[in-house]
Amino acid sequence: MCYLLILVLLFLAEFFYFRIADKCNIIDKPNERSSHTRITLRGGGIIFFFGALAYFLTNQFEYPWFMLALTLITFISFVDDIRSTSQGLRLVFHFTAMALMFYQWGLFSLPWWTIVVALIVCTGIINAYNFMDGINGITGGYSLVVLAALAFINGVYVPFVEPALIYTMLCAVLVFNFFNFRKQAKCFAGDVGSVSIAFVILFLIGMLIIRTENFSWIVLLAVYGVDSVLTIIHRLMLHENIGLPHRKHLYQIMANELKIPHMVVSLVYMLVQAVVIAGYLLFPGNEYGYLSGTIIALSLVYILFMKRFFCLHQAK
C-alpha cells in the first residue's frame, strides 16, 4: 500500500513537472546527435530524484551524504538542461557529489589509490549512462532491469542496502517509463534524468561491491559499458573529437540506419543485460572469468555488427 501511494504521488509530481516544462519551454529539439524528429519535453527524468527524495523523507533520512550528493548532481544537470553550463562548473559539482558518495560508502578509510580508481570508474559510468540516453525507452528500460536485479540480489543473495530504496526507485522508473517507453514519448529524461539514475544505480552497485568485496558485480552494467567504451575507441580510430555529438553507438545505428523501432532496440538491450545478469547469478564460482567472458562476447558482437552495418552510417 505504501509503494502504491508513492507511485501515485510520483505520477502527480511528473504531471506537475510537465506543466512547468511546457510553460517554461523546457524542450528537446532534434539535432545531429538525436535519434528523434519531434520537439519533446525535456527533463522528465527528474522523477528519479523525486523517487530518491521520497525514500529519504519516509525512511528516517537514511544515507544523508548520498542524498546531498544526489541533490547536487541533479541540480547542476537540471540547470544544464535549461541552459548550457561550463564544463568546469559541472566538474566541480560532479566531483563534489562523488566525494560525498565516497564518504557515504566509507571509502576514505581505504588507500588513496582506491579513491582515484573509484573516481575514474564512477565518472566513466555516469558519462556512459548519459551517452546511452538517445532513444525512447532505453534509459528507463535498462534501469528497470538493473534495479530489479539489485532488488533480487539484495533480497535473496546478500543484503547490502535498505530494500525500500530500491523499491522506491523502481516506482520512479515505472512512472518515467509510462511516459517515455512508447513510440511517441511524452518526455525525455534529459541530463537530469540520465545522470541522476546513473548516480543512484552507481551508489547501489558500489554498496554491493563494498559489502561483498567483489568488483565483478560491475557485470550489472556490462552492456552499456561495452557499447560506450568501444564506441569511444571507434571514434578515436576515426580521428574524431569524442567531445562532439554523434550517432555512432550500436543502438543508434540500429534505430537510425536499420530503422528498427526504438522500443525494439530498447527491449534488445534490456534482454541482453537481463541474460548476462541471470548467467552471472546462475553460475557462481568464477565471477571474474564470467565478467571477462561477457565483455569479450559483447565486444565481438559489437565489432561484427559494426563491420556489417557501419557502412550505412558512413553513406549518409
Q: Which positions does each model-derived feature cover?
A:
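C-terminal membrane-associated helical module and adjoining short loops/tails
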Residues: 1, 210-316
